[in-house]
Amino acid sequence: MNQTAYRRPTSALPNVIFALLVANGLVFALQQMNAKFMFINFALWPATHPQSPFAFWQLLTYGFLHGNMTHIIFNMFGLWMFGRDLENVMGSRRFLIYYLVCVVGAGIVQLVVAAFQGGIYPTVGASGGVFGILLAYGLTFPNRIVVPLFPPIPMRAITFVFIFGLLELYLGVSGGAPGVANFAHLGGMLFGFVLLRYWRRGRRR
């Protein structure tokens, strides 16, 4: 993909983006009805946790649960803001595959980190998928100008991605953001990068 391949979207809310927004909203509503059941069964639990061992489906389902209203609002805003143009470039099917691979990849990285750190707390949130989308956005539209919420300074999309990646790495290593799965965010970006490279190599053959 490159910036010249970009087509102005016919809709501000493409099919997969719409479906993901609805799915996340419905799951969040279910959490309000029975949070304990949802978290025990569908959050991503480290294998070291004594009461809720890892189940394979959690690598996907954790990405549809959120800790609170602020958590889901920011993730869904990022999904819509950066994902809508990508879906129009990639096509709905490939975009969905990419997003889900980033979610699962972020979960795998988080499990590895939790195993080394002895973590026992669950992980929830679409952030791994959103960070993967952010990476793809920066690589697809590198020269597009974006304005972060903080700091509100206009910058190139690729610069924004680079700064965010470094910030996540710093926070993950330093422990400066307790309760935030920084390495899961990086995992989403890593798996997204690998998948994009794989697809690009496939087109060259």
Question: Which residue ranges define each predicted feature?
Answer:
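A detector for small-residue-rich transmembrane helices and their helix-helix packing motifs
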Residues: 1-205
